[in-house]
Each structure stands twice: as structure tokens, then as C-alpha cells.
């Protein structure tokens, strides 16, 4: 008697993503899955793009203890980001589960995004034990080498985790949902319009917030 293979979480009926109805409605499919969900994720990405360097420079004072790091991390991470995007593409080419091809990666990407954001914006300030020493360290630039190394690791790991793995895992997978969800051309147009509206809305809000605090 052949042994039963253990099913993964994404093979359970709970994660079944196949749409049994013949039509795709504006709500909840398009409204929640293609408009509200993406606009929140894109807004999060926009905030990171706008505020990350300002956070490094103005909040944790990276310019005082590692001025080269603000330039080196994005440049050195370019290759890792390319590899991460290729890896996500390969994962999407695998045999689909009951949850489909894209949904497992979207669900995995969300907690990884949360972890990456924590690493990006909760970086230990070198040599800082309280508010007074944080301020003194930022003013004088007198920081410990050990603290600077730890902060550098946080910044580098958080940056690569977000841009090379977490964000491609969510965004690349979600971008493929339109073609994977339905074969109806008119319904694809509806879903594509919802995604475009989400992109424009998130870009507009993020841009206004960035300009308001420049």
C-alpha cells in the first residue's frame, strides 16, 4: 500500500483559491484583492522608498558613524536584488498547489515584509543606551565600533530582506494574478484597472507625505 504524502499548508482545502463562479465581481474580488490590498502594500513600499535614507541620516545619524554605508548598501545589494527577483520567478513556475501559483508567495511575503520593516526601522543606535546618550552620540559622533557593526548588520539585512525577497515575493506574484485569475478579457480589464488605481493612489499619497516633510 503506497504511503500517503504529507500535504503542505497550501494544499489544504482552506487555502483553495479557485474561483467557482463564472463572473468576477467588483466586490469582494476586485475591491479587496486588487484595490485595497495592493494600495496598502504599495503605500508601505512608497513610505520605505521615501523615508529610509532620511531615517538612516537624520534619526540614527548614520552619516556620523558610517557615512559610506548610505551609498554602499544600495549599490552592493543590486546583485542580491536581481537574484531575489529571479528566484521568485522560478518559484512561480513550479506546479501550482490548491492555493494556486501566486497566492502562496503572497501569503509568505506578507510576514517577511513585516520582519524586514522591523529590521529597517528599529536599528540600534551605536553606543546609545537611553535618550540622552542617543542625542549625545548623534551630536558628537562618538559611537562604539561594536554598536556601529550591529547597526550596519541591521541596515544591510533589513534592506536586502525587503527589496530582494519580501517585496518581489509579494509584488511579482500579485502582478501575475490578473492573468491567473480569469480567462475573460473584460474581467481582466476590470482587475487590471483596479490594480492601476491602487498604484496611482499609493503613489499619490506617498508623494504628498514625502513633499510635506521635506
Regions picked out by a protein language model, each given a short descriptive name:
Residues 2-211:
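Membrane-embedded alpha-helical bundles of multi-pass transporters/translocases
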